[in-house]
């Protein structure tokens, strides 16, 4: 008896959160974006229709769980369920921005740990693997009982600044906006051969931050603030103002995830920040544009990760 082993095909599908990024990733991988419709019933319930056979395929579903967070998360869960019930061979949830990541631990009594809950329901829905970038807290990787590949935005941001004249300059310093971002700031600083400084802040309440001290030499320096995400932009703009007040020459900022909610755009436009560099893990095309914001694409690194996962080769090279 002859045994026939046929390799399962690769197909990429997208929810509604960031279809432009999904199309760019599919183009780089060299496959057409799969045909699936994610719509709404009249009462707002989400409906998913897969318009092609997916039996036995290696399915990659691209969906950031950005605002509206709950809608986009439910879209992803229902898509995963639909593919599982349609007998997809393997389902990888590609989540460039992982919502609810800030609720990764109890900060006071009776707090939920929603980052863990989301990991559990993604697994329960039928995801076999998760591919994401710059989780707000790296320990979230341990919340999953399925394989998770955690890509980094620092190489993309570091390359941009290195190619635009910030590499090996004595007057450049990389600034961590808080103690929790020091590791990220150090990795970024290593790429442009710069020292680091640290802002010591406190949060009297959510989305509100106050600068207490600045550790490091920033006087007459060009400072680059780096964070994993910018939400209301309070931390980054307060930090930039504090740097200038203490003698910094110029302030640039960069982040992986541009959440940009509430007063963020107004704060950035009115701040001393000369330029904000971000990645397109979140679609900000519908937000009022700003001349200060430049968006770089993560499509090449996600496309390469998808190719490596599909071909069953190491993804770790992409973490460097």
Swiss-Prot record:
Binding residues for ATP: 43-45, 102-103
Entry keyword set: ATP-binding, Cytoplasm, Kinase, Magnesium, Metal-binding, Nucleotide biosynthesis, Nucleotide-binding, Transferase
InterPro entries in the cross-refs: PRib_PP_synth_CS (IPR000842), Pribosyltran_N (IPR029099), PRibTrfase_dom (IPR000836), PRTase-like (IPR029057), Rib-P_diPkinase (IPR005946), Rib-P_diPkinase_bac (IPR037515)
Single GO BP term: purine nucleotide biosynthetic process
Cellular compartments annotated: Cytoplasm
Cofactor annotation comment: Binds 2 Mg(2+) ions per subunit.
Keyword Aminoacyl-tRNA synthetase: no
Highest taxon of the lineage: Bacteria
Leading EC class: transferase
Residues annotated as binding D-ribose 5-phosphate: 203, 227, 231-235
Entry binding sites for Mg(2+) 2: 178
Keyword ATP-binding annotated: yes
Gene3D superfamilies: 3.40.50.2020
Protein's pathway: Metabolic intermediate biosynthesis; 5-phospho-alpha-D-ribose 1-diphosphate biosynthesis; 5-phospho-alpha-D-ribose 1-diphosphate from D-ribose 5-phosphate (route I): step 1/1
PANTHER family in UniProt: RIBOSE-PHOSPHATE DIPHOSPHOKINASE FAMILY MEMBER, RIBOSE-PHOSPHATE PYROPHOSPHOKINASE 1, CHLOROPLASTIC
Function: Involved in the biosynthesis of the central metabolite phospho-alpha-D-ribosyl-1-pyrophosphate (PRPP) via the transfer of pyrophosphoryl group from ATP to 1-hydroxyl of ribose-5-phosphate (Rib-5-P).
NCBIfam families: PRK01259.1, PRK02269.1, ribP_PPkin
Family designation: Belongs to the ribose-phosphate pyrophosphokinase family. Class I subfamily.
Protein's name in the database: Ribose-phosphate pyrophosphokinase
